[in-house]
C-alpha cells in the first residue's frame, strides 16, 4: 500500500460550476476550495492490479464531520474530480475508488480492462469493479479521516447514479454496515438483459438493412408529443410517463412523412 498526500489551496470550482449549470442540476457561483488530497494505491496479494482510492479532505474548520463516497457510471468506478470538488465545497470528505482501471467520464464505456493479455476474461479485475474495491474504499477512507482529523466521522454516505447506482445496491447488499446512508439512483443492474436490450434496435436495423433518417425519428417524437403533451394538463413540450396513452398505429403517418 502506497499513500500520497498533497495540500491543494484555492482549487477553482468554476469549471465544475459551469458544467453543473449546463446539466441544469445546480446554480451556484464559482468559488475555490482548500483541501488535502490523499491517494492510497494498493493491490491484492498474488495479483498485479493497481487500485487507487482518492480522498479529498477539507480543512478541519471546513469539515462537516461527514464522508461522502462518490460512485461512477458505466464501467468507470468513479468520475474523479467532477463531483469530488462539489462534495468538498459542501464540507464533506469526498472519497472514490478507480477499482483498478481507468476512471472518469471518458472511460465510462471502456471495457478493454476486462480482458487479460490473452483475451480471456479478467475475472479478478471484474470482481474488483463489481464489488470488492467498494468495501475496501470505505475502510480506507474512514482510516485516513481518523488519521487526519483525529476522530471518526459522524456519518458516512454513498451516492451514485446508473453504474454508481449499481455500486450503491452492491454496497447495501454486501457491506450493509459500511455506510449510514446510500443514494442509489437509476441503478444499472441486470446487465445480462438490459445491455442486449439497449443494442437490440441497432441489431434489428442491421438485420433489415433499414436505418431511419433523422427527420423520420424527429417525426415519431413530434407525433408522440402532439398526441400526449396535453394529457398532464400542461402543453409544454414534455411528456408525463404516468399518463401516456400514445399508440403508434393511431398516428397519421402518411400526413407526417409527406
Say what each PLM segment does:
Residues 1-65, 81-82, 234-239, 248-257:
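Catalytic-loop region of hydrolases
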Residues 147-158, 234, 238-241:
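Surface-exposed patches in mature extracellular/periplasmic domains of secreted proteins
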Residues 63-67, 90-93, 151-156, 177-181:
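Loop/turn elements at helix/coil->beta-strand transitions in domains of secreted/extracellular proteins
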Residues 159-164, 168:
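Gly/Ala-rich beta-loop-alpha elbow adjacent to hydrolase catalytic centers
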Residues 170-172, 177-258:
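A catalytic-pocket lid/entrance helix-loop region that shapes and gates access to the active site
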Residues 24, 64, 74-150, 196:
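Cap/lid segment of the alpha/beta-hydrolase catalytic domain
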Residues 43-45, 72-76:
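Active-site glycine-rich loops that stabilize anionic/oxyanionic intermediates
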Amino acid at each position: 500500500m502506497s499513500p500520497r498526500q498533497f495540500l491543494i489551496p484555492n482549487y477553482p470550482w468554476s469549471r465544475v460550476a459551469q458544467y453543473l449549470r449546463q446539466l441544469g442540476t445546480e446554480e451556484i457561483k464559482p468559488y475555490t476550495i482548500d483541501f488535502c488530497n490523499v491517494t492510497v494505491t494498493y493491490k491484492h496479494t498474488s495479483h498485479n492490479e493497481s487500485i487507487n482510492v482518492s480522498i479529498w479532505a477539507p480543512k478541519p474548520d471546513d469539515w462537516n464531520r461527514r464522508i461522502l463516497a462518490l460512485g461512477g457510471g458505466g464501467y468507470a468506478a468513479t468520475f474523479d474530480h467532477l463531483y469530488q470538488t462539489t462534495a468538498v465545497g459542501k464540507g464533506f470528505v469526498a472519497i472514490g475508488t478507480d477499482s483498478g482501471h481507468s476512471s472518469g467520464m471518458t472511460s465510462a464505456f471502456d471495457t478493454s480492462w476486462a480482458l487479460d493479455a490473452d483475451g480471456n476474461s479478467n475475472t479478478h479485475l471484474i470482481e474488483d469493479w463489481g464489488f470488492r474495491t467498494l468495501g475496501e474504499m470505505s475502510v480506507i477512507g474512514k482510516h485516513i479521516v481518523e488519521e487526519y482529523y483525529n476522530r471518526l466521522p459522524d456519518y458516512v454516505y454513498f451516492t451514485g447514479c446508473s453504474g454508481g447506482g449499481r455500486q450503491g445496491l452492491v454496497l447495501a447488499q454486501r457491506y450493509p454496515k459500511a455506510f449510514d446512508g446510500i443514494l442509489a439512483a437509476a441503478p444499472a443492474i441486470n446487465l445480462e438483459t438490459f445491455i442486449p436490450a439497449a443494442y437490440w434496435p441497432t441489431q434489428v436495423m442491421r438485420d433489415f438493412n433499414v436505418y431511419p433518417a433523422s427527420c423520420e425519428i424527429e417525426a415519431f417524437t413530434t407525433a408522440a408529443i402532439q398526441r400526449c403533451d396535453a394529457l398532464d394538463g400542461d402543453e409544454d413540450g414534455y411528456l408525463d410517463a404516468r399518463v401516456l396513452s400514445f399508440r403508434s398505429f393511431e398516428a397519421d403517418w402518411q400526413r407526417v412523412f409527406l
